[in-house]
Amino acid sequence: MHNLLENLRRRLLAQRTPEPLPPTSQGLARPSHDVVRGPCDADIPPDARNTMPEGITVEEALAVAELPQKHALDILATAQAIRSVHKGGPAALCGIVNAKSGRCPEDCAFCAQSSHHATGSPVHALLDAETLLRRAEELRQSGAERYGIVTSGTRLTVRELDTLCEAAVRIRRETGIALCGSLGQLTPDAAACLKEAGFSSYHHNLETSRSFFPAICSTHAYDDDIATVRAARAAGLRTCSGGIFGMGETDAQRIELSATLRELDVDSIPVNLLSPIPGTPLQHRPTMPPMRALVSIAIYRLMHPARDILVCGGREATLGPWQSWIFLAGANGMMVGNYLTTTGRDMADDLAMLATLGVRA
């Protein structure tokens, strides 16, 4: 093993992760701010967050990224060792519903739902409470702990937000599944409403680094997305924010995004891999080489030893038969079921894979 990797491995393994809060009769402990948590690193007591293990520096991450290809397996092995110590519990699983689809005024180059692109993406208004409840129960029975309600558009209207919060109260009461909102840009007042309705987490991807963002989106500012993550965190919501790999960014820009996520102290990092969609500006972009994608995931684990890292959209197209390697690369969870506008892998196949790996019963 390269000396750099061995030194990083020893340093990260020597650190300790704070013990999670103990279970309660309701299934999970509740911190003093009464946010319902999933089986994730947000179960760490708030006063222990400052003692979370420190990841490698940006300079060290760049050095790892520059190692020759012959060291790729050693990079994965290093990340897997860190995952097994700091995030070695059962794989975290989340699922989503496309609760409002299409006609988005943003021009994100990767997105099928943008009104700027001719993709033939489904278009529908906000789903009713019964449909949202049915999808929640399906995911809960399949083993997902967290249910993401995702809507297209810059942000919800006040009426849509009220409707969704009313549905959330019922979903929490009847299924018990942890709720995550992915509803676009968020004001502090909207974040407070979501928390009161029973949402425990808010998802809002930065998508890419600040330096590469102008090549991906021109209809809103990078700081708008950062403000949303901060508003969610200030409201007591668990924050979930990551990006998409393979849009043409460099290794350094993926590391730049990782550093920004660390500055924001996000709880969970979803990693998506570009699946080029016909009709979008990135439709002809080749998929990322599988090993490069895995090494990039591994670097994120080294930078975030004790945070949740979930691999989500695009894993089928980019990784193919190497999908199970995401755990060898340091991920500790994944999205299951279908995505927003593309079909995911059969749930039974994913659960069988997890059982074979020993990361899920």
UniProtKB/Swiss-Prot annotation:
Residues 14-38 are annotated as: Disordered. Binds 1 [4Fe-4S] cluster. The cluster is coordinated with 3 cysteines and an exchangeable S-adenosyl-L-methionine. Pathway: Cofactor biosynthesis; biotin biosynthesis; biotin from 7,8-diaminononanoate: step 2/2. Its cofactor is [4Fe-4S] cluster; [2Fe-2S] cluster. It comes from the Bacteria. Residues 86-315 form the Radical SAM core domain. InterPro entries: Aldolase_TIM (IPR013785), BATS_dom (IPR010722), Biotin_synth/BioAB (IPR002684), Biotin_synthase (IPR024177), Elp3/MiaA/NifB-like_rSAM (IPR006638), rSAM (IPR007197). [2Fe-2S] cluster binds at residues 180, 240. One of its GO terms (molecular function) is 4 iron, 4 sulfur cluster binding. PROSITE patterns: RADICAL_SAM. Its EC number is 2.8.1.6. Disulfide bonds: none annotated. It catalyses: (4R,5S)-dethiobiotin + (sulfur carrier)-SH + 2 reduced [2Fe-2S]-[ferredoxin] + 2 S-adenosyl-L-methionine = (sulfur carrier)-H + biotin + 2 5'-deoxyadenosine + 2 L-methionine + 2 oxidized [2Fe-2S]-[ferredoxin]. GO terms for biological process: biotin biosynthetic process. [4Fe-4S] cluster binds at residues 104, 108, 111. It holds the Pfam family Radical_SAM. NCBIfam families: bioB. Homodimer. Catalyzes the conversion of dethiobiotin (DTB) to biotin by the insertion of a sulfur atom into dethiobiotin via a radical-based mechanism. This is Biotin synthase. The gene is bioB.
